[in-house]
Design a protein with these regions (language model features):
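Short, flexible/disordered intra-domain loops and linkers
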Residues: 18-28, 105-111, 182, 230-243, ...
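Active-site environment of divalent metal-dependent phosphoester hydrolases
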Residues: 15-17, 61-64, 94-107, 176-178, ...
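N-terminal active-site segment of His-dependent metallophosphoesterases
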Residues: 1-71, 75, 85-88, 101
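Binuclear metal-dependent phosphoesterase catalytic core
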Residues: 270, 274-353
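Active-site neighborhood of phospho(di)ester-bond hydrolases with catalytic His/Asp-centered motifs
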Residues: 8-10, 52-59, 85-96, 219-223, ...
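Beta-strand-turn-beta hairpins that frame and shape the catalytic cleft
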Residues: 1-7, 152-169, 216-217, 289-295
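His/acidic metal-ligating clusters that form di-metal
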Residues: 43-50, 160-169, 178-281
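Extended active-site neighborhood of metal-dependent phosphoesterases/phosphodiesterases
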Residues: 73-199
């Protein structure tokens, strides 16, 4: 690709018109839909430079409704058409809202009251299966092929004709997402990490690590957060809190494969943290016990209603990942249905050297 920037979005939350998506389904006299705002941002930022790709870190829908996935598919196709992107230029991972996160109240609102005495656990399990089927149908529509069994994905970009960027999209929603049972909790699993590393060419079939070539940027993208995002969580009796259950396993995987950046959404809050990690922290650094520095960056939400945004920063964001300089730059731009994109980023994060 001649282009040297990738647009990153997250937590768009398309719905059936009764959910929490903040933008109109199509442009009108007063407001612009999300695809128009994203294309407008890309055109303003490009300065003659082509957009090279689109990354979405989960929660494309509000409650995994068919209508939400249809709007998500239309959105991706509209943006792709306007920016001359192909399916090979797009990478996504599912969020917990895409694969069946639902409470009893939400279930009855969406599906209606059950006419039988079917246990709630069975209803929730069936809803989860149906949600996953909706996601797979959406994936096939966008990419013209079936997804991997674990819903992971990988892409390798050659930007500006010489910069190699490898992006591994992980499914952090392996566990069934049911209220009062793994509500919002992330889980990736050892098998998925091994499969992705091998598919990306980071590890051979014997489990031996393949050295990262000089100048290559490696990115892992998932939906759930790995470190604390909110300053404090409200305590509720018997409440399940949102965590990634195998976060340490993923962080060790990042060190082993020298991944430079982890991108995620989920909490609708933008943040950045730089971590220096050793595989065995109580032992000296060595070839078999390497030290690695990487950044974890959270985008927030690109399309959810203001009622679901943090009070401290009640805005929707898109991030431009700009690879044109010596260091990767993450530039966060506000998206607004009534006003066009600003020329200047609200936040700018300098990447690693």
């Amino acid at each position: 690709k001649k282009g040297e920037f990738i647009i990153w979005l997250s937590d768009i939350h398309f719905d059936n018109g009764k959910g929490k998506h903040a933008f109109p389904a199509q442009d009108n006299d007063q407001q612009k839909c999300l695809s128009s705002r994203v294309v407008e941002l890309a055109d303003k930022y490009s300065n003659g430079n082509k957009c090279a790709g689109l990354a979405i870190s989960g929660d494309l829908t509000w409650q995994s409704q068919v209508e939400g996935f249809e709007l998500a598919s239309k959105f991706i196709k509209d943006v792709s058409s306007s920016l001359s992107l192909t399916p090979d230029d797009i990478i996504i991972c599912p969020g917990n809202h895409d694969v069946g996160l639902v409470s009893k109240e939400q279930y009855f609102e969406i599906m209606g009251k059950p006419t039988t005495d079917t246990p709630w656990a069975t209803l929730a399990e069936n809803y989860h299966k149906g949600s996953k089927e909706n996601y797979i149908k959406f994936y096939k529509d966008v990419f013209q092929r079936k997804p991997e069994e674990d819903l992971s994905q990988g892409r390798k970009f050659l930007l500006g004709g010489h910069k190699v960027v490898e992006v591994a999209a992980l499914n952090s929603c392996v566990l069934q997402q049911v209220k009062d049972s793994f509500l919002g909790m992330g889980f990736i699993g050892e098998k998925q990490l091994s499969n992705v590393a091998e598919s990306m060419g980071w590890m051979n079939k014997s489990g031996e690590y393949i050295s990262k070539k000089r100048g290559v940027t490696r990115i892992a993208m998932l939906h759930h957060h790995l470190t604390s995002i909110n300053e404090a969580e409200d305590a509720y009796l018997d409440s399940k809190y949102s965590v990634t259950l195998d976060a340490e396993r993923l962080l060790r995987w990042v060190v082993k494969h020298k991944v430079d950046y982890i991108l995620h959404g989920h909490m609708h809050r933008s943040s950045c943290i730089t971590i220096k990690k050793i595989l065995s922290p109580l032992e000296p650094v060595s070839a078999s016990n390497p030290e690695h520095t990487f950044q974890i960056i959270s985008l927030g939400s690109s399309g959810v209603a203001s009622s679901e945004l943090p009070n401290q920063d009640c805005a929707n964001y898109a991030c431009i990942m700009d690879f044109s300089g010596e260091k990767l730059a993450f530039k966060f731009f506000k998206l607004d249905r009534q006003n066009g994109a600003n020329e200047t980023a609200t936040y700018a994060i300098e990447g690693l050297s």
